[in-house]
Amino acid sequence: MKFGIHLGIRGPVAHPDTLRTIALEAEELGFSYLGFSDHVVIAEDVNSPYPYTKSGRWFAEDTGECLEQLSTLSFVAASTSVIRLLTSVMVIPHRPPILTAKMTKTIDVLSKGRLTVGVGVGWMEEEIQLLNGPAFKDRGAASDEYITAFKNLWTEESPSFEGTHVNYSGLKFFPKPVQYPHPPLWIGGEARLARQRAAKFGDGWYPVGNNPRAPFDTAERYGQGLREVHENAVLLGRSTSDITAGLLAIWYKLGTSDETNTGARRAFTGSSKEIIRDVEAYRERGLQCLIIGGENSNLEACLHRMREFKTEIIEHL
């Protein structure tokens, strides 16, 4: 089983020396992945409900501070040599498809094949509108075309695509990514359509566990969701072994328990023994890569959380 760290790139950790220190420490501790969230701009008025809180309020909406995800991953790539670089997740409608394929491919080349592209359709309508993305109601269909275009651009000698949201032909797109046939694509999202997208397009399924409308915050719920992904993949003629089972436990908390929407203890919160049992239970149901939420408040708190997870959890599995 592999483990990783997820960070929002804002606040005290969004500083070059701090990011470099965190990345090198994560690599030294043996984490397999370092991932960053994706916001480009924050609207002055955010009315879109945040999927991962009961209230629907996004905890960072009062500040417009955020570093751009792909640029930050390029910076981290130059500071590290082993750890995989994860877009956790990249919101597909935020960027034009050809440019996105070029930027991600460039990171894969410069990192010598260490990029994993986690993708999602996004939740903040205002941000997608500000970035001149597709209509919010069309973002799922547009994202499917973008994903198809990414693979086409990454792999074909003479790429071309004709769709409703993406059209191109007559272009050269070199060099190709280091990873063959392309960097792994992990499909984020918890809803039924996201699970279907993972089955159709994904090299991995990468949900966040604490979506109140589609929770995977218990091993049983996660196992059921993964089974649905696998069943849909088989119907499409794919092998389930081609789909990595991931999870973002953004709510990880050692020492204090949180509750699910049913009043039960939320997985990956509580004592070290409870969290170890959670990891084992999820692993038994197919989980392969667990990414925990990092600590954004300051450098020392972030380093402490990584070291604590290594010594209190990983070393006892």
For every predicted segment, state its role.
Residues 1-317:
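Active-site-adjacent structural elements that line small-molecule/cofactor binding pockets in enzymes
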